[in-house]
């Protein structure tokens, strides 16, 4: 298949592109290199995909690119591109979130509608659409009440996907990711920050009391869900939770990191941040039903992989 991966230089996009290439597909990757974090990190993420002669890359923003040309001959679209970050989505920055997350998605859907050859459009949604949930595990039918401007834009884009499916039969699938982690995780995300702090012998900063819980999902499980969403006909039109299968406190995460790092860990507790939810925990029965999805990587295994990755990149920085 000929695949388009948007946000290909990012955390999920780069892993997904590598998997598609290894599976024998042709991949066109697009990325705008938005300055949310260092471009050099994204360039490093692209080293794997760029080693394949079946990979091509276009730098540009989906708002401005000629999408008719971009989608010509494409079978599968994996729409991972977004302006990320819950805490940064307040205030004047919201305009960027609406442009990158809502308007870009609408342009992609409209072009897919008129392009004619798209077999699947998989949208990377987010658990942020649920907001501060009150009952667990969270079902896809649970109340959607985003707790941040970022969550509002992710829900708006997801709703657009659903609308284009029901009105025009654009073959969309929306996957609601729950806290994805692993090698190449963005530097602003908690596990990356935790690993870096340990390596620098600095205290880990936790916002709130550490008893907040998350359903953490390892990157390879998220990639597998995307592949299955592209290949399972029954998935078309569905919205599904993609999660790791366990509810863990941040204090438990610290204990695991101390074990995998072999280093004592110091922690400081700070005020809860605007937009941060207290708990997440997903019901993934729908993904099991339609995708035969079942997460394979335990938190212990995944954190060990992420810590090894962090150790490799920050060792290089120190010795450079």
Annotate the PLM regions.
Residues 209, 237-240, 249-255, 262-279, ...:
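C-terminal "lid/loop" region of Rossmann-like NAD(P)-dependent oxidoreductases
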Residues 16, 226-230, 257, 303-310:
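Hydrophobic "lid"/C-terminal helical patch
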Residues 299-320:
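Amphipathic terminal alpha-helices
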